């Protein structure tokens, strides 16, 4: 996105990411957090400020990872005079606290899931909430995101352990063990709405995404638009998202997340004040580059200016269907255990209607245990949902990734499942369909051949015996 608008790009990288693609693709790249661990290096806000000062940086984009919702980064950018490409500081603070976010949604008149009025600090409070609202309930981290710090509780017997696990996970992931409670809805769809707002008071939605294919509250496959929901319900959800964000004068890209139930009702979950991993499917069906739009909004443009060219809400239409699959170095047959190692071979899919957003996906890349296991995002577009599925299946089958395990066979099973085809799946889809984890035996001929060539190159032909030179009788030639 920065290259498209002719912006000089300065990247940061940790010692462990020395060979990463983003370091080599940027115009300039500098080591951050020298002497610190792989995570702490990227969280070193003061060192980021130093690099920005020393290398004439004008603006900082937080990405969608470590610091994407960190209000301290936005605050330091303002103090140092750097443009923060994202929401205002107040919005990061407002929506970073999930209880505060619920309050804002309530003020906007958005339907809410029954929940605790504030944080809970004892098992007794959780028991009281369960007695009032009934099981199942869900425990959530106040500062949470990405499915971490969340535990569903189905009975009193599970309550104490779930409470302890949620608090410890929240503390480890977010630096705070504050939690709150919500009633757990059975078999909903996870629907989110992409919002764009500028500094001129304009706020629009770019329609919705269906993110219901998930495991342990972490998304695996995303679809846009949410074609399986009635159009009237989709419109109501999008209008509610815009209403909430207009109420707080939101700026930049953001996502409002909801649960939609089988009775065609919907309920607010949270706001993510950042760009999200799955923004690609929205870009494909609307033709709007969301990250590039963020950059231009930060420069002061209106979303309706020619430089951005987003039309009025009534003229923002969708065209076709898009699917995103997150290809990860995880082993679905082993409880999605992350795998590490070196990619000894890598070949990606491609073709018309296929988009790849790569991480460190290349032959020779070393997959470490330090960061997220996402290897590459594959997004396909088609005039219909079925066409998008067909293109994705072809794309996945064209991939050749050797050296580490991946979830590609699992993704193929998801795409071919009847519930995914007709859109009738819910957030329980993966849990309820154990057949998704039945995989055909792979021949893996490529890896076997590579291993064989490497072995004989180093060790010789150990399986071929060396015979003594044969002796032949003198040849009698006729005279």
PLM features per residue range, with description:
Residues 1-256, 260-276:
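N-terminal beta-alpha lobe that positions the nucleotide/phosphoryl donor
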Residues 241, 280-479:
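Catalytic cores of soluble metabolic enzymes centered on carboxylation/carboxyl-transfer
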């Amino acid at each position: 996105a920065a290259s498209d608008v002719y912006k000089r790009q300065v990247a940061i990288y940790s010692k462990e990411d020395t060979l990463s693609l983003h370091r080599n693709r940027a115009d300039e790249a500098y080591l951050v957090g020298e002497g610190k661990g792989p995570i702490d290096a990227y969280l070193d806000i003061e060192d980021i400020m130093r690099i920005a000062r020393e290398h004439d940086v004008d603006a900082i984009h937080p990405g969608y990872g470590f610091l994407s919702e960190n209000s301290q980064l936005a605050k330091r950018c303002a103090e140092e005079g750097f443009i923060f490409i994202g929401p205002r500081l107040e919005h990061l603070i407002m929506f970073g606290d999930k209880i505060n976010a619920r309050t804002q949604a309530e003020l906007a008149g958005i339907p809410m899931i029954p929940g605790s009025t504030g944080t809970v600090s004892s098992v007794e409070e959780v028991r009281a909430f369960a007695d009032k609202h009934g099981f199942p309930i869900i425990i959530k981290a106040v500062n949470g995101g990405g499915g971490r710090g969340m535990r569903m509780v189905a009975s009193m017997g599970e309550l104490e352990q779930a409470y302890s696990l949620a608090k410890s996970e929240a503390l480890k992931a977010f630096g705070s063990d504050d939690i709150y409670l919500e009633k757990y809805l059975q078999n909903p769809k996870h629907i989110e709405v992409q919002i764009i707002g500028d500094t001129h008071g304009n706020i629009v939605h770019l329609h919705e995404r269906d993110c219901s294919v998930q495991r342990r509250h972490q998304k695996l496959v995303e679809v846009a638009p949410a074609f399986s929901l009635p159009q009237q319900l989709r419109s109501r959800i999008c209008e509610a998202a815009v209403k909430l964000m207009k109420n707080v004068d939101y700026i930049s890209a953001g996502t409002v997340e909801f649960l939609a139930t089988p009775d065609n009702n919907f309920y607010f979950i949270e706001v993510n004040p950042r760009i999200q991993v799955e923004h690609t499917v929205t870009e494909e069906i609307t033709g709007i580059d969301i990250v590039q739009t963020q950059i231009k909004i930060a420069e002061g443009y209106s979303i309706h200016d020619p430089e951005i060219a987003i039309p009025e809400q009534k003229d923002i239409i969708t065209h076709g269907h898009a699917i995103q699959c997150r290809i990860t170095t995880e082993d679905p047959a082993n409880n999605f255990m992350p795998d590490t190692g070196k990619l000894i071979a890598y070949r990606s899919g491609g073709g018309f209607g296929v988009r790849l957003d790569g991480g460190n996906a290349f032959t020779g890349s070393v997959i470490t245990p330090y960061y997220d296991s996402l290897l590459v995002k594959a997004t396909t577009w088609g005039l219909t949902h079925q066409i998008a599925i067909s293109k994705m299946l072809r794309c996945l089958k064209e991939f050749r990734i050797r050296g580490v395990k991946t979830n590609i066979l699992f993704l193929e099973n998801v795409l071919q499942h009847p519930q995914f085809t007709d859109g009738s799946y819910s957030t329980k889809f993966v849990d309820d369909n154990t057949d998704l984890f039945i995989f055909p035996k792979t021949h893996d001929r490529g890896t076997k051949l590579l291993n064989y060539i490497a072995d004989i190159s180093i060790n010789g032909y150990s399986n071929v015996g060396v015979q003594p030179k044969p002796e032949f009788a003198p040849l009698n030639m006729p005279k």
